[in-house]
Amino acid sequence: MGSKRRFSSEHPDPVETSIPEQAAEIAEELSKQHPLPSEEPLVHHDAGEFKGLQRHHTSAEEAQKLEDGKINPFTGREFTPKYVDILKIRRELPVHAQRDEFLKLYQNNQIMVFVGETGSGKTTQIPQFVLFDEMPHLENTQVACTQPRRVAAMSVAQRVAEEMDVKLGEEVGYSIRFENKTSNKTILKYMTDGMLLREAMEDHDLSRYSCIILDEAHERTLATDILMGLLKQVVKRRPDLKIIIMSATLDAEKFQRYFNDAPLLAVPGRTYPVELYYTPEFQRDYLDSAIRTVLQIHATEEAGDILLFLTGEDEIEDAVRKISLEGDQLVREEGCGPLSVYPLYGSLPPHQQQRIFEPAPESHNGRPGRKVVISTNIAETSLTIDGIVYVVDPGFSKQKVYNPRIRVESLLVSPISKASAQQRAGRAGRTRPGKCFRLYTEEAFQKELIEQSYPEILRSNLSSTVLELKKLGIDDLVHFDFMDPPAPETMMRALEELNYLACLDDEGNLTPLGRLASQFPLDPMLAVMLIGSFEFQCSQEILTIVAMLSVPNVFIRPTKDKKRADDAKNIFAHPDGDHITLLNVYHAFKSDEAYEYGIHKWCRDHYLNYRSLSAADNIRSQLERLMNRYNLELNTTDYESPKYFDNIRKALASGFFMQVAKKRSGAKGYITVKDNQDVLIHPSTVLGHDAEWVIYNEFVLTSKNYIRTVTSVRPEWLIEIAPAYYDLSNFQKGDVKLSLERIKEKVDRLNELKQGKNKKKSKHSKK
């Protein structure tokens, strides 16, 4: 990071310390003087309903007696008629048949592995079985159940709150990044695995919990893998803590071995036979082929809802529009039944996610009404949608890939694994025999799809992970017990990046800046940029830009309306690039004019995504609270000042100095600094001039290498802000190094001239 020279009384020589480092040191001192208040003590109901029962000795019969009573033992209120109806449905789930067997295993072991196919009821029922045995409300503890995805954490918490006849956010709640719907009454908390990891950074023993359930462990997310390694250590220190590892797939022996031969209980799902159909040849346009297949099913097949798997929000929303339009046409022209089409992806607001559980529309003239759910791979195992009889599987999903040599992490549309294909097909056989239409050949399934997806830890940039592990007190990363250890090169890259960001010192120890950066739920690069932004007199603006970078794309560009959408975007465009354009969009969104116009209509007319913008607004507020908590100054430069935009670009360079590209001399495109990758600027950028040097937010791997969300910067800023990274002795020979050498000479000459002038001034003043 860039350095300022700071003199201290203990050190007569100047000590080089970056601005963010100084801010972190001050924040650390202040927090020692004024420690943050700990969380509120838990408050629970106890009117003796559990009297006579012994913790960790509850039988299924005793628990069911409490469930069948008139009074809710967790609230003291009478059960509602709706509760009684739901209880009957719950008792029919496959897990209920094995409640006694589960309890015996749970009571006699500290760690157990539970396998239940999607639809067996494991995610909603097992945590409730645990509550009746743990009695957390009498012990002042909580039960945690982690989910890899936010959507699942929210929707499952809502369902379980209904099942337990309690209010969501009270006895049952959820915690996801930037949203906490729990209270001091909460005894069962559904949360993303990342949120539990953040809690562990503050409380290494997770002392608030008496039982932790890691659900969907087969997904092998980064956070789940780290939690598993961490919990292996915690259980040694906490013999009172119980762990349940839950998986939807039967390859659970690996989990058993990892947890020292933990016992396993498997519960079969309720599945009916599923007929598989393959295409005779490769489908060039899988999206078009998927839409045609859905419409063909609707026109020709018997009653039953359809689940279509696609790769992301844009693709899903496009398909929702097309299927809705063509479905209406089928109703009018062919007399087909009505069609309700619902999207499902991570950034969808909770009330819209819930619509997927609505019943299908009524039949019309004897033709069945149908519900179509178009989802990312979240519907593979995380959520169960009743009524699905037909699955359309194009065979793709978005997967993160990372190349440590060129430090590029990208989301790529890639073929799914055989395990995923089987999970998808299984969704069709939940309520009756179903059909799965695979939009690829049988030969491709047998020969081209890998058996299992690679764990996320093997295909990710590990900077955030290493910072988390350091904050968790794990210094020996080489010997940390990963289920699948990442490549040493990936680990080295992460350590190197964190060292350049001054989050780790040269010995690999956490610095005050690293400790402070780890408090922000952001990529370390963004956290460091935000912490140091006050020095550039623009922390308010950087706060906004960071929030805007943390949400899905705010610009909407419909296929039929590209020209209008581009014209609307140009209203906000700033010639220096996309980051300041995002700032302009946010300011316009928050303006009185937009609200007087009607904010939803304003967003529609300007081709902006209201959901993304309101999410950015929420994230900004939360980050602002963190800034205030750690006494980080919130400031801005006068908008009329000629320095206003330069200050913002300098602050951006202080975070993105490792993501820089230079225009190629005498050739088209750019070349990335240090890694020498040929790249093009993404067509979506608004950069209004041929900038020589740019920072970029992401590297997009498609048929060509693109850099996206770019802003022009001056190379002298980079040398000044990040001298360690721009130590030219570490650069390969070539155009980038030559240019930087020339700029460095120029900067050094200017500095010498300044120093010469200052010496003359001091001589005159002495005279």
UniProtKB/Swiss-Prot annotation:
GO terms for molecular function: ATP binding; ATP hydrolysis activity; helicase activity; mRNA binding; RNA binding; RNA helicase activity. One of its GO terms (cellular component) is spliceosomal complex. Residues 1-74 are annotated as: Disordered. The modification Phosphoserine is found at residues 8-9. Belongs to the DEAD box helicase family. DEAH subfamily. DDX15/PRP43 sub-subfamily. This is Pre-mRNA-splicing factor ATP-dependent RNA helicase PRP43. It comes from Saccharomyces cerevisiae (strain ATCC 204508 / S288c) (Baker's yeast). Residues 58-70 have a biased composition (Basic and acidic residues). Changing residue 247 to L: In PRP43-DN2; dominant-negative phenotype.
